[in-house]
Amino acid sequence: GRLLADRRVEVITDDQTETVVGEHGILAAGSVPFTIPGVDIDNKYIVDNEGALAFGETPKKLGVIGAGVIGLELGSVWRRLGAEVTLFEAADTFLPVVDQDMSKAAAREFKKQGLDIRLGTKVSAAKVSRSKVKVTYSDGDQEHDATFDRLLVAVGRRAASENLLCADSGVELTERGQVDVNDQCQTSVPQVWAIGDLVRGPMLAHKASEEGIAVAETIAGHHGHFNLDTVPWVIYTDPEIAWVGRTENDLKAAGIDYRSGSFPFAATGRGLAMGDAAG
């Protein structure tokens, strides 16, 4: 469906189209994977994150484009299941959104686990031939080829705002294609709200849930409260990576005075019980 003017929603099914009207409307269409030129996803040999959950067997060699959250989560799972995993990351910095002490520690652990993370590499093409995927990539001025049994494209996700709004809906989008909202998740149209992956902030399910609760409370006449700065971020790798609030780099960039401290994971109760010193 899509949003029309005056809080009307056009609902399209296989056999009919109807229009419904509401006093309030909440946009929660989620997100879709990014694609890159020269790499066509068939979800058999070249897959997105959903396709990477449907392999019939463990690939001997798995290539991953993108060493961000999705690439690391799925890449590390298939590594633990026995695949040789190579991750191509265009950025020169590993996990730049994460506190740098944490990202450095995580990079060391992933290397020990056998993940081959290649920073500063850009994939320009991927072709399927004889049940293999040939990947062409560059690192600086040098171009290389690599062959894999499967290739996962994990270069992030974007708001699913395409075809969501008609021209006269009145709802505005940002330059990134997200629905533009204020701190209360209200759009440019009164009584129309947007939450989750459609709007600014991390694309996390619990963030969308909190936004939905806050919007429902506001619609009901209560004080809906949501603070984007206190949303926990998490990357489901082993070891897990998680944080709440601003990172040290964020504080430095904002010119905010701060104190920092650290505590080794090996000295925590969980670390001692599991015999795990990483972190």
Question: What name fits each language-model region?
Answer:
Residues 2-10, 81-183, 246, 253-259, ...:
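A Rossmann-like FAD-binding core segment of flavoenzymes
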Residues 42-58, 147-219, 225-226:
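FAD-site-proximal beta/loop scaffold in flavoenzymes
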Residues 29-84, 88, 113-117, 167-184, ...:
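Glycine-rich dinucleotide-binding loop and its adjacent helix/turn
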Residues 99-101, 112, 123-125, 160, ...:
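Mid-to-C-terminal Rossmann-like scaffold of FAD/NAD(P)H-dependent oxidoreductases
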Residues 2-26:
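Conserved redox-cofactor binding core of oxidoreductases
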Residues 36-38, 74, 128, 162-164, ...:
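Short glycine-/acidic-enriched loop or helix-start segments at secondary-structure transitions
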Residues 15-24, 141-150, 188:
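Core beta-strand elements of the Rossmann-like FAD/NAD(P) dinucleotide-binding domain
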